[in-house]
Design a protein with these regions (language model features):
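Metal-dependent de-N-acetylase/amidase catalytic core
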Residues: 1-32, 50, 99, 112-282
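ATP-dependent adenylation/pyrophosphate-handling site
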Residues: 18, 22-79
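Short beta-strand segments
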Residues: 56-57, 106, 172-175
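A conserved beta-strand->alpha-helix junction
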Residues: 58, 94-107
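Flexible loop residues that form catalytic
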Residues: 61, 107, 140
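A short acidic, glycine-rich active-site loop
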Residues: 74-83, 196-201
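Short, solvent-exposed amphipathic alpha-helices that sit
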Residues: 80-95, 153-157
């Protein structure tokens, strides 16, 4: 049975990696990311290959702290969140992803870590409804607490659903960012022994598509300039222990005032995992 599951993930990796016009049929995929642009950063050039894909944004991309809203040029957080959603829908539309394929859990940016239980429960419901063969999501790497919270929720939701699925969905990862020696690393993975990386060198047409998708995110231009256009990377998700740091040393988000530090995050993960497993996710 496990070989069958792995082959579905391998099939998706082959589909994402192929540079030809016809990569073949992709498995049924749900993309689950923390913010409305993370899927474009990590997989924008390949989303058009995922026919019928469902995209889930865990947060609305708007922190509650008013400074973020004002710096982005909006009077309220709701206006900022609405703009981020419209930017993302425009970008996804370029890849053939329709608005009805996109779902919002609508938690505030920087608050996913404090909502691990409700997020996991929502994902259990959605995965049960959609029944994907593969979930594409963030890795656990200490880059952004919302990214790590999303990874936690995906892995825990899959664990809670194992008894219901004949073939539980394979979890694959797209890239975001993390810190190495105090320097940001983008569009690559924190190494995990035994888990190889599929590197995709994008064609000229694919780079142009991704550039046009990036251009849709007017509010995020300063952020997106950190991410290269020419390459995307994917891998099978390792078996994480979310109660331990993803790497030694200072985590990327610990350099910023993003509402939480690593020790507190891991305490919340431990508490949420214990409660969810003891209650069966209910």
């Amino acid at each position: 049975m496990e070989r069958d599951v792995i082959s579905v993930g391998a099939k998706l990796l082959d589909c994402l990696s192929a540079n030809g016009a016809d990569p073949g049929d992709a498995p049924k995929v749900v993309v689950i990311v923390a913010h409305p642009d993370d899927e474009v950063i990590g997989a924008g050039a390949r989303l058009s290959r995922l026919k019928g894909v469902t995209v889930i944004h865990v947060t609305n991309g708007a922190p509650r702290e008013p400074d973020y809203t004002l710096r982005a040029g909006f009077a309220t957080g709701d206006e900022y969140a609405g703009a981020r959603r419209e930017e993302c829908l425009s970008a996804l539309g370029l890849a053939g992803v329709a608005p009805e394929q996109v779902r919002e859990l609508d938690f505030a940016d920087q608050e996913a870590s404090f909502n691990l239980i409700p997020i996991t429960r929502r994902l259990v419901e959605i995965l049960r409804e959609v029944g994907p063969e593969v979930v594409l999501t963030h890795s656990y790497e200490g880059g952004h607490p919302d990214h790590d919270a999303t990874a936690f929720a995906v892995h825990t939701a899959r664990r809670l659903l194992e008894g219901e699925f004949t073939r539980p969905p394979e979890v694959l990862e797209l890239t975001s960012y993390y810190s190495r020696g105090g320097q940001i690393v983008t569009s690559d993975f924190l190494p995990f022994r035994g888990y190889g990386v599929r590197t995709v060198r994008l064609s000229r047409e694919a780079r142009e598509l991704k550039r046009r998708m990036f251009d849709c995110f007017v509010t995020q231009r300063e952020v997106l300039r950190w991410f290269p256009i020419g390459v995307e990377r994917y891998r099978a998700a390792p078996p994480y222990d979310f109660t331990r740091p993803p790497h030694v040393g200072r985590l990327h988000y610990e350099y910023f005032n993003w509402g939480i530090k690593g020790a507190r995050w891991r305490t919340l993960a431990h508490e949420a995992l214990s409660r969810l497993l003891n209650e069966g996710g209910l």
